[in-house]
Amino acid sequence: MAKVPDLFEDLKNCYSENEDYSSAIDHLSLNQKSFYDASYGSLHETCTDQFVSLRTSETSKMSNFTFKESRVTVSATSSNGKILKKRRLSFSETFTEDDLQSITHDLEETIQPRSAPYTYQSDLRYKLMKLVRQKFVMNDSLNQTIYQDVDKHYLSTTWLNDLQQEVKFDMYAYSSGGDDSKYPVTLKISDSQLFVSAQGEDQPVLLKELPETPKLITGSETDLIFFWKSINSKNYFTSAAYPELFIATKEQSRVHLARGLPSMTDFQIS
């Protein structure tokens, strides 16, 4: 088992001969800042470069210092201040050689908020205003028509020969009392109680059956709200629950949410 690396020997070399090493360590402890973090303190650029390139074989000594906190964040930065890697360690844990190699050489996994809804939107209240469009058809930029899947839960696109299969929509306008530049709406399949709802990036939109057209939409129900924007003859629908995502299509595939290309996000309404 390899021990938690001691980088104090390396930090000593970063101070000039005229500087008091022990007083620097005391100052560091009082402020409870990690000595591992190259972004703290007044270390020279050469020290930062040395820290980034440390190998576990060079840092196998035990530390004789006592820390008030049981956890420390280890991070490495480049010379221009960009964080290259970051780890949170516990001094109560033992580490294998593989653990230390991973900390030294591997970048921390990035958490992708691809499907996380915009949480502050749950505080908004959308009140039903009026029916603005009825029994209209939406075609994408490839002139594909939207139709309902056999399972009735999803929408797909293709070039239809039988236009009786194309889906017609009703659009209801809502008011949130918030940003006047946005136009919140719901999309309902005509002659039904099936409403289009968002599920996340690259996920198909889901058809939710509701007993009636909702008069007030709040909280988790904001997946029913889309912001309608019309530019010339192109129409866009941005999700209120996922503000960076649009209702989108691909060639002969399910209608889904996407940021843009390779998906198509503009529609013709007729």
Swiss-Prot record:
<keyword id="KW-0964">Secreted</keyword>
<comment type="subunit">
    <text>Monomer. Interacts with TMED10; the interaction mediates the translocation from the cytoplasm into the ERGIC (endoplasmic reticulum-Golgi intermediate compartment) and thereby secretion. Interacts with IL1R1. Interacts with S100A13; this interaction is the first step in the export of IL1A, followed by direct translocation of this complex across the plasma membrane.</text>
</comment>
<dbReference type="Pfam" id="PF00340">
    <property type="entry name" value="IL1"/>
</dbReference>
<dbReference type="GO" id="GO:0005829">
    <property type="term" value="C:cytosol"/>
</dbReference>
<keyword id="KW-0395">Inflammatory response</keyword>
<keyword id="KW-0963">Cytoplasm</keyword>
<keyword id="KW-0325">Glycoprotein</keyword>
<dbReference type="GO" id="GO:0008285">
    <property type="term" value="P:negative regulation of cell population proliferation"/>
</dbReference>
<keyword id="KW-0202">Cytokine</keyword>
<dbReference type="GO" id="GO:0006955">
    <property type="term" value="P:immune response"/>
</dbReference>
<keyword id="KW-0539">Nucleus</keyword>
<dbReference type="GO" id="GO:0034605">
    <property type="term" value="P:cellular response to heat"/>
</dbReference>
<dbReference type="GO" id="GO:0005125">
    <property type="term" value="F:cytokine activity"/>
</dbReference>
<dbReference type="GO" id="GO:0070498">
    <property type="term" value="P:interleukin-1-mediated signaling pathway"/>
</dbReference>
<dbReference type="GO" id="GO:0002248">
    <property type="term" value="P:connective tissue replacement involved in inflammatory response wound healing"/>
</dbReference>
<dbReference type="GO" id="GO:0032743">
    <property type="term" value="P:positive regulation of interleukin-2 production"/>
</dbReference>
<feature type="glycosylation site" description="N-linked (GlcNAc...) asparagine">
    <location>
        <position position="139"/>
    </location>
</feature>
<comment type="function">
    <text>Cytokine constitutively present intracellularly in nearly all resting non-hematopoietic cells that plays an important role in inflammation and bridges the innate and adaptive immune systems. After binding to its receptor IL1R1 together with its accessory protein IL1RAP, forms the high affinity interleukin-1 receptor complex. Signaling involves the recruitment of adapter molecules such as MYD88, IRAK1 or IRAK4. In turn, mediates the activation of NF-kappa-B and the three MAPK pathways p38, p42/p44 and JNK pathways.</text>
</comment>
<dbReference type="InterPro" id="IPR020877">
    <property type="entry name" value="IL-1_CS"/>
</dbReference>
<feature type="glycosylation site" description="N-linked (GlcNAc...) asparagine">
    <location>
        <position position="143"/>
    </location>
</feature>
<dbReference type="GO" id="GO:0035234">
    <property type="term" value="P:ectopic germ cell programmed cell death"/>
</dbReference>
<dbReference type="GO" id="GO:0005634">
    <property type="term" value="C:nucleus"/>
</dbReference>
<keyword id="KW-0666">Pyrogen</keyword>
<dbReference type="GO" id="GO:0005507">
    <property type="term" value="F:copper ion binding"/>
</dbReference>
<dbReference type="GO" id="GO:0071639">
    <property type="term" value="P:positive regulation of monocyte chemotactic protein-1 production"/>
</dbReference>
<dbReference type="GO" id="GO:0010575">
    <property type="term" value="P:positive regulation of vascular endothelial growth factor production"/>
</dbReference>
<feature type="glycosylation site" description="N-linked (GlcNAc...) asparagine">
    <location>
        <position position="64"/>
    </location>
</feature>
<dbReference type="GO" id="GO:0005149">
    <property type="term" value="F:interleukin-1 receptor binding"/>
</dbReference>
<dbReference type="GO" id="GO:0097192">
    <property type="term" value="P:extrinsic apoptotic signaling pathway in absence of ligand"/>
</dbReference>
<dbReference type="GO" id="GO:0006954">
    <property type="term" value="P:inflammatory response"/>
</dbReference>
<dbReference type="InterPro" id="IPR000975">
    <property type="entry name" value="IL-1_fam"/>
</dbReference>
<dbReference type="GO" id="GO:0001660">
    <property type="term" value="P:fever generation"/>
</dbReference>
<protein>
    <recommendedName>
        <fullName>Interleukin-1 alpha</fullName>
    </recommendedName>
</protein>
<comment type="similarity">
    <text>Belongs to the IL-1 family.</text>
</comment>
<dbReference type="GO" id="GO:0051781">
    <property type="term" value="P:positive regulation of cell division"/>
</dbReference>
<keyword id="KW-0597">Phosphoprotein</keyword>
<dbReference type="InterPro" id="IPR003502">
    <property type="entry name" value="IL-1_propep"/>
</dbReference>
<feature type="modified residue" description="Phosphoserine">
    <location>
        <position position="90"/>
    </location>
</feature>
<feature type="modified residue" description="N6-acetyllysine">
    <location>
        <position position="85"/>
    </location>
</feature>
<dbReference type="GO" id="GO:0050714">
    <property type="term" value="P:positive regulation of protein secretion"/>
</dbReference>
<feature type="propeptide">
    <location>
        <begin position="1"/>
        <end position="114"/>
    </location>
</feature>
<keyword id="KW-0007">Acetylation</keyword>
